[in-house]
Regions:
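Structured alpha-helical
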Residues: 1-103
């Protein structure tokens, strides 16, 4: 069974190897998230996403450069999985079960 994935758009403070950086949270699911940043972040770096209610720890497993910056995927630790009960990003849209209508 695949995890429910959600699109979102929210500025987040992400601690990367003990340094705080502002990044944009683009997508989230129970085991991970995708972020956008203006500067590169090394693959394998340990990160913490802190919100007012919770902390999600993990590591960067993929980094891609694109026209406007850097996109990277974080795999959350099994000890800190994401749930909407702990942190609900603004502009959340579930995409895992959306189907496009054919005309």
């Amino acid at each position: 069974m695949s995890a429910r994935r959600y699109l979102c758009s929210e500025l987040i403070s992400l601690r990367i190897n003990a340094i705080d950086a502002m990044v944009n949270l683009e997508e989230i699911w129970d085991r991970g998230a995708v972020f956008e940043a203006e500067k590169p972040i090394p693959e394998g770096a340990r990160v913490e996403m802190r919100t007012a209610q919770a902390l999600f720890a993990g590591k960067i497993i993929r980094v891609e450069q694109h026209e406007f910056g850097w996109r990277f995927e974080v795999e959350f630790s099994p000890l800190t999985p994401w749930s909407a009960d702990q942190f609900l990003p603004r502009h959340l849209l579930e995409v895992s079960e959306r189907k496009v209508e054919q005309k």
